[in-house]
Amino acid sequence: MGHPPLEFSDCYLDSPDFRERLKCYEQELERTNKFIKDVIKDGNALISAMRNYSSAVQKFSQTLQSFQFDFIGDTLTDDEINIAESFKEFAELLNEVENERMMMVHNASDLLIKPLENFRKEQIGFTKERKKKFEKDGERFYSLLDRHLHLSSKKKESQLQEADLQVDKERHNFFESSLDYVYQIQEVQESKKFNIVEPVLAFLHSLFISNSLTVELTQDFLPYKQQLQLSLQNTRNHFSSTREEMEELKKRMKEAPQTCKLPGQPTIEGYLYTQEKWALGISWVKYYCQYEKETKTLTMTPMEQKPGAKQGPLDLTLKYCVRRKTESIDKRFCFDIETNERPGTITLQALSEANRRLWMEAMDGKEPIYHSPITKQQEMELNEVGFKFVRKCINIIETKGIKTEGLYRTVGSNIQVQKLLNAFFDPKCPGDVDFHNSDWDIKTITSSLKFYLRNLSEPVMTYRLHKELVSAAKSDNLDYRLGAIHSLVYKLPEKNREMLELLIRHLVNVCEHSKENLMTPSNMGVIFGPTLMRAQEDTVAAMMNIKFQNIVVEILIEHFGKIYLGPPEESAAPPVPPPRVTARRHKPITISKRLLRERTVFYTSSLDESEDEIQHQTPNGTITSSIEPPKPPQHPKLPIQRSGETDPGRKSPSRPILDGKLEPCPEVDVGKLVSRLQDGGTKITPKATNGPMPGSGPTKTPSFHIKRPAPRPLAHHKEGDADSFSKVRPPGEKPTIIRPPVRPPDPPCRAATPQKPEPKPDIVAGNAGEITSSVVASRTRFFETASRKTGSSQGRLPGDES
């Protein structure tokens, strides 16, 4: 509800109606004063909460950054390196977000609190002082008027004239106070519209700018998040594969602990008790014994040290070993040995009957050799029947089930697998099995193929080359990694290399249908790494290298065409691709090392500065405003480039070949587009940088046209200059994961007709005089372009983009 204006003429009359209207203004002024106090109070609470929140986030990021992953083994995979660096990347991202927020919080008091407090104290407080003066002068005037009216007419003329002058003077003072008070209260009533709203607007502007920077960082984070999710999934797959092998190893160790021997360790070792004869009788002394069969050396370390004497290990050379007859001694599990260093016989006591058998077997004792309690499955050979079996399995899989989801991952029935293998490898009629029979489904055939390969007497990639292949996969030099594996493949025996080529060619065909069967090279590596490669010893250390076996198979699949194109060049060292300026090494994915964005200038200027429009002299001599009206944000389409050669480091054969047509895609697919951009996608054309490509969806114009913060500084380029828009990488080079210099495309609209872009206002000499020069218009333009650096447009027309 509006208030009637206070006329200056009413100040002289000072009527009851005037006083009533003035009282309404005073009540509104008091309500405004209370409102400003509440805004200041709640604003301080909000700023304090934001500061506390930012401090908590920074403390959280410090906690993340302080943690360092430890690992088992001597080398991490590429995916594990990405995971190990992830907390540091998270902390850097959180710190960047909170640094922007703290800048906004630091300026919030100057933007919101101080202007409101100044208005309340200076304007409203000054109005209250005017009110006090008005009331004081009015009280004095009416009091004097009452006394003046009670003067008797019989007073002297000089006294009456003096009294009249005094009343006129007080009336004049009261009238001036009334005019000043009415002017001031109406001025505050009108000026509060912008003096209160402008600080809140500036505060919201800085708040939304900070939020928009958070949105930009979220877009930067999207491709990193998807790459890290892929690394996490790959690592989880490696873990599942390793866990299965570790469980099998633990199971075997429970059944026969002595069957697993580490390389470089003694043939057998453990605790034995030795019979020692003394003058006062016989004692049994505990020793830790280690026996090396090749040199027949028995090392005995005493466990019970005699007081005052430090005994070291004793090395003895074994001559022979024989089991002690049970009736000849009252102790169990005993056997005798004879050595070159000691005369006579040494009687040893094992811990159990099984333990004595193992010691005697290792020492070639005069007792029947007891075999290991583990009964191995019947080993299969890499012969003609095996090749025939593998070819038949591959043919039926590629004919009937290559698009089956989870191919090779889904396990078939063990009964059916054994039935198929027994029928095919029957010595009476080997290979006489009809794979088209309905009894053999795809899961049974794939499981049978894996079972055959795992139970070969020697793995396809041999024990001899196992360490070299794992060592090559551990290298951080991607070129050496590929070259070394290429060289080692041609060191395999002929039939092994033929079988490996047959299998890898089949796996490449499977991966080409990964959209249907979901089996990527990484997934196939997890399945066939332990199948084609196997350490000779069953140890935990060997199990921890399974993930590198998976990487070897993954590289064979991804670079099948290069590896099997021919043997590498003859040289002492493994061949590597053509030399580069710097070696192409794996680098962990990162978002913290990208280019710094141009920092947005928050609104911190005084209101007086905003009233003057920034003007400059154009080349034709016309004075124009350098502040442009706001333009709706245009989101350019994300360009995709195609390199001439594929990346030999990570390219999947199942990746579809992109054409030059850029299709619209939703926001969730941005990470895929970015990864294609970095791995090599479609080539940039000038049309792609100047406007939407044919077939692309219409640009979605937001309903709220807020100016987004300027992107990270780029090299100046003209429209249509593709080279300045995207730098072409050398073939195969893998950059760090950074966000491309343009915004990702918006989701396409449902409407078929494209929206017409709003025309740019061209400010030229002919219409320069039509620009509104009012204070309101200048302030409006100032706030709409508060994030623009005013100095960047000097020396050119506002509409010039070149």
Swiss-Prot record:
Tell me where in this chain the PH domain is found.
265-368
Q: What ranges does the record list as Polar residues composition bias?
A: 616-627
Q: Where is this region: Disordered?
A: 569-588, 607-666, 680-770, 783-802
Disulfide topology: none
The entry's keywords: Cell projection, Cytoplasm, Disease variant, Endocytosis, GTPase activation, Intellectual disability, Neurogenesis, Synapse
Q: Which CDD domains match?
A: BAR-PH_GRAF_family (cd01249), BAR_OPHN1 (cd07633), RhoGAP_Graf (cd04374)
Q: Does the keyword Repeat apply?
A: no
Q: Which Pfam families match?
A: BAR_3 (PF16746), PH (PF00169), RhoGAP (PF00620)
Tissues in which the protein is found: Expressed in brain.
Q: Where is this site: Arginine finger?
A: 409
- On whether Glycoprotein is a keyword of this UniProt record, the answer is no
**Record-annotated Rho-GAP domain positions:** 380-564
Q: What processes in GO biological process is this protein linked to? A: actin cytoskeleton organization; axon guidance; cell junction assembly; cell morphogenesis involved in neuron differentiation; cerebellar granule cell differentiation; cerebral cortex neuron differentiation; establishment of epithelial cell apical/basal polarity; maintenance of postsynaptic specialization structure
| A GO cellular component annotation in the UniProt record | cytoplasm
* Highest taxon above the source species: Eukaryota
| GO MF entry, a single one | ionotropic glutamate receptor binding
InterPro entries linked to this entry: AH/BAR_dom_sf, BAR_dom, GRAF_fam, OPHN1_BAR, PH-like_dom_sf, PH_domain, PH_GRAF, Rho_GTPase_activation_prot
Here the segments flagged for biased composition (Basic and acidic residues) are 716-732
Q: What is its main location?
A: other
Please give the function described in this protein's UniProt entry.
Stimulates GTP hydrolysis of members of the Rho family. Its action on RHOA activity and signaling is implicated in growth and stabilization of dendritic spines, and therefore in synaptic function. Critical for the stabilization of AMPA receptors at postsynaptic sites. Critical for the regulation of synaptic vesicle endocytosis at presynaptic terminals. Required for the localization of NR1D1 to dendrites, can suppress its repressor activity and protect it from proteasomal degradation.
Matching PANTHER family, A to Z?
OLIGOPHRENIN 1, OLIGOPHRENIN-1
- Subunit organization: Interacts with HOMER1. Interacts with AMPA receptor complexes. Interacts with SH3GL2 (endophilin-A1). Interacts (via C-terminus) with NR1D1.
The name this protein carries in UniProt is Oligophrenin-1
Q: Which organism is it from?
A: Homo sapiens (Human)
